[in-house]
Amino acid sequence: MGRFISVSFGLLVVFLSLSGTGADCPSEWSSHEGHCYKVFKLLKTWEDAEKFCTEQKKGSHLVSLHSREEEKFVVNLISENLEYPATWIGLGNMWKDCRMEWSDRGNVKYKALAEESYCLIMITHEKVWKSMTCNFIAPVVCKF
C-alpha cells in the first residue's frame, strides 16, 4: 500500500510539472513561454496562411514574434521541420494606412502606386524579416 501511494504521488508530481509546458498544447504542436506553435509545409499566400491558421485552433494566427528568444525558438522549430528558406510571419499590410511624403517635403498629390500590399516573411537562416508581396507563397507557422 505504501509503495502504491509513493508511485501515485510520483506520477502526480510528474503530471503537475508538465502542466504549463507541452502538456497544454495539442499533439504535434510545440510549446514555448505559454504559447503553442506549429510549422506547416503548405505553401500559401499571406492572406490564405492567416485564414488557415485561424481555422487550426481557436485563437491561432500566423506567428507573432515578441522577443529574440521567441524568434530563436521559432527559427529552430522551422529548421527542424522545413528546408524552405522563408516563412510567413503575422505582420502584414503594414503600409496600407501610412502617410507618404516626398523626400523634398512636397505634398503627395499624384500617385501611380500598384495596389499591391506588402507582408513580412522571415528569412530563416539569416534571422531577418523582409517585406514581400502578400501574393508570394511561403510555408506557414501558426501560433496560439
Curated annotation (Swiss-Prot):
InterPro entries: C-type_lectin-like, C-type_lectin-like/link_sf, C-type_lectin/snaclec_domain, C-type_lectin_CS, CTDL_fold. It comes from the Eukaryota. One of its GO terms (cellular component) is extracellular region. Gene3D superfamilies: Mannose-Binding Protein A, subunit A (3.10.100.10). Disulfide bonds join 25-36, 53-142, 119-134. GO terms for molecular function: toxin activity. Residues 1-23 form the signal peptide. Residues 32-143 form the C-type lectin domain. It is found in: Secreted. Pfam families: Lectin_C. Keywords: Disulfide bond, Hemostasis impairing toxin, Secreted, Signal, Toxin. Interferes with one step of hemostasis (modulation of platelet aggregation, or coagulation cascade, for example). Heterodimer; disulfide-linked. Belongs to the snaclec family. This is Snaclec 6. It comes from Daboia siamensis (Eastern Russel's viper). The lineage of its organism: Eukaryota, Metazoa, Chordata, Craniata, Vertebrata.
